[in-house]
Amino acid sequence: MSKSKSSRSTDIIDIYAKPDIKLKVLEPRQDRELRVELEGRSINHAIVNAVRRSVMLYVPIYGFHRSNIHIELNKFKNMYNFDLMYNIFETLPIFDVPNFMDLIDPDVYLPVELSKNLFGRFVQEQYTEQSDQEDKLVDATKKLFKIELTLNYKNNTADDKYISSHDCVIKIDGKTSDGYLKRRPICLFVLKPSEEISLRAEANLGIAKNFAAYEATTNAIHEEKNPNKYVITYKTLEQLNKYVILNKACTIIYKKLENLQDYLLRTYTEDRDPTEQIDIELYGEDHTLGTILENVLQQCEYVEKAGYCMPHLLIDKILVSYKLYDDSEIGPIKVLNDCITYLIKLYKQLADLVPKK
């Protein structure tokens, strides 16, 4: 350990110790709301913000993409155009999908491209038709839910008919779901007398980072009580249980970190000189990973300075840079690897603390 580091900084963390975390479920103020308090010496703004971002951006959800909405042309007799119909059904939620296991074994349950988006590819990839076809063949073997919505309606009355979610039939793995009927109807559009519509939509798995139709929650926020105590608040959109969402958000972060650790071990087979500044480019990543890596490196006893940047706002690529003290006892790649191990332990512990309800 560098003496200069210990004498100048009061926020050093021991990356070799067990993370100090407590999780407390608070009383919700609204229906479907989850409020959890995270507290402990290992909790700070970066750790909590990564959870918040993961809740909002990364939890996989089934939704209707317009490419999977099929309108029957000879029964589409109304005043609307196809684009409007696509927009309506893309934003229609799907309720009560028993999708609890997809992160346990991503190789079995997640499409290839989605798995890469979630858990990191870290290197720049080049799209080819061959790779796309290979991914489709692999995806065909995945254990995904088959979710299908149908709507067939002709207004045979003399009055306008408000078409709602109650007029839709949705099936999950061939079984009719009562997710729409047991909730208040969601108004979709109006059919005038003698107008009709017939369509079928198939759901696929996606994440909100790529398309907002796959949001699992309303806007997630965190509130600072003190530097080591925060409250995270969000409301589930009812496809997934509110506790399942939090567990998945933490699981995604630690699995992403595990993949990053594997990538570093493959890429850096030998350590570097402790006096050397290390710059690592990670493609496909954004502020979620960048902030927690920066934070843990800045609080590590061996690191003199550390930071990250996202060079382009519209391109997912981060550059992580750090330098050890010259008298450091271990190499920079080993330090980074140990810091990542600490973060993996932290988020695993956090996931285990989420109630199983």
Swiss-Prot record:
Subcellular location: Virion
GO MF annotation: an example: DNA-directed RNA polymerase activity
EC number of this enzyme: 2.7.7.6
Keyword terms, alphabetized: DNA-directed RNA polymerase, Nucleotidyltransferase, Transcription, Transferase, Virion
Reactions this protein catalyses: RNA(n) + a ribonucleoside 5'-triphosphate = RNA(n+1) + diphosphate
Main localization, broad class: virion
One Gene Ontology CC term in the entry: virion component
Keyword ATP-binding: no
Pfam families in UniProt: RNA_pol_L_2 (PF13656)
InterPro entries cross-referenced by the UniProt entry: RBP11-like (IPR036603), RBP11-like_dimer (IPR009025), RNApol_insert_sf (IPR036643)
Name this polypeptide is given: Putative DNA directed RNA polymerase subunit R470
